[in-house]
């Protein structure tokens, strides 16, 4: 079993408070490495930076004073952001969980206690609270597994490409690596076609 994020996102910005989503979004994208805080989807496969949202962990509709508080913000894909909307189980901004219902900040270690990935890349829940988050955020959508595997293939191809270039410079044989590189390219295209065939949002 794996964690949703290979590296847990950390909100590093602590400077001047910005009162626009656009200013906060730039810093969130850096802190979250351009991946959704909840599902880990890399924005490049879903329209890029402009398509992703600034998510308010404690909803701004209920806690207006936190609208531009950086520690309450996340970088989120539109699927997770729209699924969560202004859902909040507690009566205060700090009461995010009541019993086995509620949400966990993905920047905390606790998030990994409730949710993870199986060996095929699908998001899975580990606890009753994790199941609640899983269902509310629609983390069962196939796109999360597909995008996870797309990025794994991309990273493997990058490593192979570097090794191929090194062998070329040393006049060493590289055909074996080139075969694998091309096979991964075909696999990447197959996964990408699955995303194109995916149903529209919220189906």
Predicted regions and their residues:
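Histidine-centered nuclease catalytic patch
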Residues: 41-73, 84-99
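Cys/His-coordinated zinc-binding microdomains
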Residues: 40, 78-81
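Short, charged surface segments at domain edges that flank catalytic/cofactor-binding sites
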Residues: 1-38, 63-67, 71
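Domain-level detector of nuclease and nuclease-like folds
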Residues: 85-160
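The −1 position to Zn-ligating cysteines in a subset of zinc-ribbon hairpins
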Residues: 35, 53, 76
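C-terminal, charged low-complexity interaction regions
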Residues: 132-203
